[in-house]
Amino acid sequence: MKRMLCGIVLVAAMACPALAQERTKSAEGAKVAITEPANGAVVTSPVTVKFAITGMELAPAGSDTANSGHHHLLIDQTLADPAAAIPADDHSKHFGKAQTEATVELKPGTHTLQLVLGDKNHIPHDPVVQSEVSTITVK
């Protein structure tokens, strides 16, 4: 009985890497960018942020369309783990309906903004498609 149990545990442990989700490949040369506000801009809240994408298509979250994804806006943080789903919280905004702009409330002060393209499961592509970090000041 112990031998059988050890065998089952060993087989299960060996199968675990196969159960890990493989990251979606990004198209070569794909890019995302924040087109507004400009890096260094002084703005008032709420802030309208406009997104651009080249080399891939926008598709709603959950869509299994090749060479596609949807935007995630990181506010005052950087991508923690490119192999994990991007969380939805105050610092990570999901745009799973394939939106190309959003209005966000920001407190006065300096803030960083960065776009990351996520696949159908909100996981960054491989390689990661992300914008440069933009710094803005909210009056």
Q: Where do the protein language model's features map onto the residues?
A:
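Low-complexity, acidic Ser/Thr/Pro/Gly-rich terminal tails and inter-domain linkers that flank the onset
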Residues: 29-31
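Hydrophobic helical h-region of N-terminal Sec-dependent signal peptides
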Residues: 6-15
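Sec/Tat signal peptide C-region and signal peptidase I cleavage site
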Residues: 16-20
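Positively charged n-region of N-terminal signal peptides that target proteins for export
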Residues: 1-4
